[in-house]
Structure formats: structure tokens, C-alpha cells
């Protein structure tokens, strides 16, 4: 009698997850474990049981590829349709392009840093489950950069300012803000990297980035950007889960971890809040059709959601970040202060700025009844009047940069919106300047790291931001022109005033051809 074949019992979700994570691990014998994993102890974090780390999604690599493949098929169908049907002409206004340029120049390259960071963290954690989770997030972030590039590349065919992203990333002054954020995280230990990216950014602050950009894209007819946002949304839910799982895992492992984690939370909340001031400007000024104000977004996603999170973490001994109160007060001011900064330095930015219309000023007055009319409307109207007289304001001097966040000193003192916030520290006979108490404290804890900051303004003054062969002693030398050529700007096309720009003229002409006989 022949033996009957018996179907093998399929593994359940828990068993499959264990098989595809911890089942892949082994105890090293050729080298001691501390030599194989040299970085998971030097930050002072104590881990007693790596098996306590469990991914609530229990996602394994075979399932991961299946889900991502399905999403990619849908995404690239939309991208192709958008390109074939001239979807770029369906956006509300060519001013919206500046928001996408800012995202492409300043946010998308950060994805590459996060890829490197999670790949490294996955290599240096001893726990198999944490390594697999970090590996999948590294692949996620690589995919996000690729889909953003493929979605936005269609705009590069028709409009200025989308070119030379990698070249600009290492050189342009305002891009040093996200670049320094990413490099600070990337040069941290693996646990600090998790708190910086997975917790502080992905869990606490990510909605302040993705909701404004993706909702703004939907409101303004940019279906290509909306689609890559939706395609990334399910990934972001896993990333947020990794963030909360990471911090709770660290806090539950040993009481000695609490003060270390608290210091990281203080640091990275403030660094993230400063970085997102660029998003606040975009929300309040760059979207022709607005979703909500920065103030409203901060109240929902930071104060309500973040406040509930820190109340939950209080049982572990974690308090709200040191900069919490100052960041909440700044919600009334930062978007206006950053917009005015970029308006005046618009000649040195690879996107356009403009004077808001009367309707847009009225909208801002209703959204910021306590501050806008008192502090910012008069300045904007003054600049608009000068522009109408043919005296468009461009700053030709260089601003002082904060050593930590690298934003020009444009923010004001907490409690006094009429006074620029300015702090100084002398370290080894050198003077360092900061925009706030919190940036100064971050420097004070890691001075040897931040004295190495590559500050664009300082580098320009040192003569390090000119193309080879440029002679600064020549009689006709124009330093601003030389720096912008070093940035690889197409002068008069990528930068400057929106009104009368090539992007404005082309969009109007192409829209007219598409909608008229």
C-alpha cells in the first residue's frame, strides 16, 4: 500500500513571524557577540531581553514584497496616466510648484539618509526582530525616494528648479537645515537614531509633514503627488508603530535607560520642530488652495495627539520635551517669520516667492487673530508696496546661522515677537551662535560634534563656495552671482520673484492652449 501524502500544516501568523525573524538568528562562535555588535552598548542603553521586542504587525519579508508589489502596480499606473494626460496643467496655480520644489529639494533627499541609518541600525542590533524591522524600513524609505523621484520627474520636463537635486543638497544654504538634521541622526548611535527618526519624527511629528503636503496636493489638483503619498501611508503606519514600540521597549528594559531616552526626546523633538518650520511656511503661504493653517495643524497633531502620547509615557517616567511650551507658543509666528525670510532671500533660493493677495492676507488674519494683523501684515503690505513701485526687496547680505539647526536667526524670543532670539556660547576660544535656548543646550551636550557643523554662510565668507577657477580678487567679481553659479542655479529662471517668472508665463500659456480653441 502506497503511503498517502499528508498536507503540511501551514504555520500560523505567530509561528511564521518567529520563523522568519528569530529563526534566522544564531549565536556567534567565531567572534564574541560584543565584537559582532559593538554599538548597542556604548550609548549606555541596557537591554536584558531582546525577545521582548515584537512587531505588532508581525510582517515577514515574503508578505512585505507581496504588499509592496501590489501598491507599486497601482502607483505607477497613476504616474503614467498623469504624464500622458498633461496632469501638471490641472494644478490650481503655478505658485503651487514652489511647494513641490521645496519638498523635492529639502525632504526627498532625507529619505536616503534614513535608508542608510536603518540599514546600519539593523546591522548593529542584537535582536533579530529589531533587525528585520529596521531592514524593512530601510527598504521602505528607499522605495519612498524612488516613487517621489518618479512622481515629481514629470514636473522637471516643464518647469524650473527641479534639476540638480543631489548637487544642491550639499551646497545650498537653506538645504543645510534638513541636511544637518539627517547627518546629526546618521552619526548618532543606533538607539538614538531610533528615537530621532522612528519616535520623535515618525511618531510625534510625521503627521505635520505628510498631512499638509499630501492634503495640499489633493486640494491643488496634484494627483501624482497624492498617489505617492497614499502609497507611502501604510508604510508610515508601520513606521509609527516601530517608533512607539522602540521607546517602550527601551523604557521597559531598565530604569537606567529613562534619563538617556529623555535627553534624546528633548533634543530630537526640538530639532524636528525647527525643521518643520519650512512646512509651516509652505502650508500658510505656498498653497494657492489651503487645507488648514500651520497653527491648526500644530494644535491637532502636536498638542492633542502628542499631548496624549506624553501623558501615556508619563508612567515610564518620561515628561514632555523641554521645548514643548516654546514650540506651542511659536505656532503663532514661525510660518510668517520663515516666509518673510525666504521672501527677502528669494534671489538665493531655487523656488519662487511672491506677495500674498488681499484674500490670502484676510485668510491669515482669520487663522491668526492674535498675531498676524499686529506683527506681520504691516510688514508684508510694506514689502508689497515696494514691489509695486518697482523696488522688490532682496537681501544681498548674508544672515547669521544657528550652529545647531542651521536656520538663519529669524525667530523671536518666547513672549516677545518684536525681539530676535540670539544666544552665544564660547567653546575653546571660538564663539558659536544659536537661535534658542534649546539649540544652545543641544550644542552644550555635544560640542565636539557641532563645532564641525558645515555652515553655508561661514563657508561662503571663507571662499569655499565658488566654482574652480573663480578669482575673488578680479575687479568685476560678483560674489552673489559666483555663489549662485556654484549652487548650479539657472539665474533668473530658478530663483527670484514669481510674478513675471518663466514658470508663471509657461503655465498660463500651456493652460490656455489646453482649455481654449
What is the meaning of each model-derived region?
Residues 82-103, 164-200, 218-220, 268-289:
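Acidic/His metal-coordination segments adjacent to aromatic residues that form catalytic metal sites
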Residues 102-178:
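Long, hydrophobic, well-ordered secondary-structure blocks that form the structural core
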